[in-house]
A protein has these predicted regions:
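Consensus positions within tandem repeat domains that build extended binding/scaffold surfaces
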Residues: 14-19, 37-42, 60-65, 83-86, ...
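A generic local structural motif
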Residues: 195-198, 284
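Extracytoplasmic soluble-region selector
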Residues: 233-298
C-alpha cells in the first residue's frame, strides 16, 4: 500500500492501525475522524505526505514515531495536545508548523528529530515535558512560548548545535540535565522570575554566559557555579495579549498571557483590574470573574 484516502464516514482510527506499513507514502484523514489510537503510523518509513483532520484536538501517543522519511507537516489549528513520542525518531523532519491552540507538548515528542533546525512554539503553550527535544542535533533556533513556566528534565539534552536560547519571562525552574551535552551552548537569557536551577542543568558552564537581571537568582546561580554573567536592562517595545476582549461566566477563570517584544525584555509584567468586584487578576495573569459587569485588565 502506497497511498490511503479515507471516506468521510470514518470517525475513529485504532491503535497500530497502519504501524509498520513501510511502503506507505501518503495518507489523508477526513475531517470526520474524531479520535486516534496510539502508534497509528509507527514505523511507516516511506511516509512523506500526511493530511490531518481539521478539527482534531489531540495528536496521539507515538503517532508518527520512526517515520524516517517524513520531512514536513502542518498541525491543524484545533490541536491542543501533542502527546508523548509523537514524532520521536522522525530523522528527516525539518519543518513543522504548530497552531496557536497548542497547550502541551508531551515527553520525548521530538526526540531524535536530527534534521529539525528551527521551531517556533506558540504563546498558548503552557508545558513542554521532559526530553521533548532531546538529541535534536541540528536544532539552532527555537522560540519558546511565553506561557511556559518550567524547562523540564532533559528537554534539550543533546541539542549539540544549539548556541543560544532565550527563556520566556515566566520561567521559574530549570530542571536536571535540561541542557546536558549542549556542546555549543554559549549564551542563555534567564528571566527574573527564575528561582530554581538544577546544578546539573548545564554540562559546560565554563564555556557559556548567562544574561539576566542584576540581583536575580540567575546571577546568584552564575556566581555559585563560576559561570560568566552579563546584567542587562532591555525595555519592552511591544506587548501582545492572548486576548483583547473576553466574556466569562461568574466564577469562571481564564489565563491571560502577555507576549513581550523583544523576547528578552527585562521589564516586569504587572497585572491589575479596573474593578476587582467584577473581575480579579493575580500576578500571573489568571483572571477570575466575580460578578456581572465590565472590567479592564491591564
Amino acid at each position: 500500500i502506497k497511498e490511503i484516502v479515507f471516506p468521510d464516514s470514518v470517525v475513529d482510527v485504532q491503535d497500530y492501525a497502519f504501524a509498520g506499513c513501510r511502503s506507505l507514502k501518503k495518507i489523508v484523514f477526513p475531517d470526520s475522524v474524531k479520535s486516534f489510537g496510539k502508534d497509528v503510523l509507527c514505523g511507516c518509513t516511506s511516509l512523506k505526505e500526511v493530511q490531518l483532520p481539521k478539527n482534531m484536538e489531540w495528536l496521539s501517543y507515538s503517532m508518527f514515531v520512526n517515520c524516517t522519511s517524513l520531512e514536513e507537516i502542518d498541525i491543524p489549528d484545533s490541536v491542543k495536545v501533542i502527546d508523548s513520542c509523537a514524532f520521536e525518531g522522525c530523522t528527516s523532519l525539518n519543518r513543522i508548523s504548530l497552531p496557536q491552540s497548542l497547550k502541551t507538548i508531551g515527553v520525548s515528542t521530538f526526540r531524535g528529530c536530527t534534521s529539525l533546525e528551527k521551531i517556533k512554539l506558540p504563546d498558548s503553550t503552557k508545558q513542554v515535558q521532559g526530553n521533548a527535544f532531546e538529541n535534536c542535533e541540528a536544532l539552532t533556533d527555537i522560540k519558546l512560548g511565553v506561557g511556559i513556566k518550567s524547562i523540564e528534565s532533559k528537554t534539550f539534552q543533546g541539542c549539540s548545535s544549539l548556541e543560544f536560547i532565550i527563556l520566556p519571562y515566566q520561567v521559574e525552574t530549570i530542571e536536571d540535565n535540561a541542557f546536558k551535552n549542549c556542546t555549543k551552548l554559549r549564551k542563555i537569557t534567564i528571566p527574573k522570575a527564575t528561582t530554581s536551577i538544577s546544578d546539573s542543568a548545564f554540562s559546560y558552564p565554563d564555556k557559556m554566559t548567562i544574561y539576566g537581571v542584576a540581583g536575580s537568582y540567575a546571577e546568584q546561580y552564575a556566581k555559585k557555579n563560576d559561570i560568566a554573567f552579563v546584567a542587562q536592562q532591555i525595555a519592552t517595545e511591544k506587548i501582545t495579549l492572548s486576548e483583547t476582549e473576553l466574556t466569562l461566566g461568574r466564577n469562571e477563570k481564564y489565563q491571560l498571557t502577555a507576549g513581550l517584544n523583544p523576547m528578552d525584555s527585562t521589564d516586569e509584567v504587572i497585572w491589575s483590574s479596573s474593578d476587582e468586584k467584577i473581575a480579579k487578576v493575580d500576578k500571573t495573569g489568571n483572571i477570575e470573574a466575580i460578578s456581572a459587569g465590565e472590567a479592564v485588565i491591564t
